[in-house]
């Protein structure tokens, strides 16, 4: 019985330390977005022009910074696609992933249909201070509510989106 209590205490300490470390890493890697209201509209690869402020006005917007060459993004992109199909407000920004035709061909081959902006030269990524892909940024009413970099689960992102909508 004493041994079980010791293990439970050590597990609880480990979970608290892991959560604190994860939160600290998110704060350290947190992007510094530009002033959303001053951003020009951006153009999707399909030619549609969108405003981030307008997209996040009614419900939270998940901005997914990713790249076709990113190994972790190959795991997270299908999850983002599921969220998009579930009705989550998603906009993706593909950083340095080739020309529009190549990007769209690659997305079609993987069954990815979420809206995408092609950031061929990495200017948007730099403007948003994106240091790693994938990075998930959640905007609500033009304000950044949450961000995280690296792998995240579908439920982790859904929870962040739910929290942003409160």
Predicted regions and their residues:
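Thiol/disulfide oxidoreductase modules built on the thioredoxin-like
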Residues: 108-112, 120-166
């Amino acid at each position: 019985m004493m041994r079980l209590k010791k293990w439970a205490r050590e597990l609880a300490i480990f979970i608290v330390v892991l959560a604190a470390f994860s939160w600290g890493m998110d704060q350290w890697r947190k992007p510094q977005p530009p002033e959303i209201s001053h951003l020009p509209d951006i153009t999707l690869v399909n030619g549609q022009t969108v405003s981030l402020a307008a997209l996040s006005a009614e419900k939270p917007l998940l901005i997914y910074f990713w790249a076709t060459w990113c190994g972790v993004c190959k795991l997270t992109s299908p999850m983002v696609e599921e969220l998009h199909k579930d009705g989550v407000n998603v906009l993706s920004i593909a950083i340095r992933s080739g020309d529009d035709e190549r990007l769209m061909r690659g997305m079609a081959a993987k069954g990815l249909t979420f809206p995408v902006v092609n950031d061929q030269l990495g200017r948007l990524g730099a403007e948003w201070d994106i240091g790693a892909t994938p990075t998930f940024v959640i905007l609500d009413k033009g304000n950044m509510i949450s961000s995280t970099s690296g792998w995240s689960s579908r439920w982790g992102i859904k929870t962040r989106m739910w929290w942003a909508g409160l």
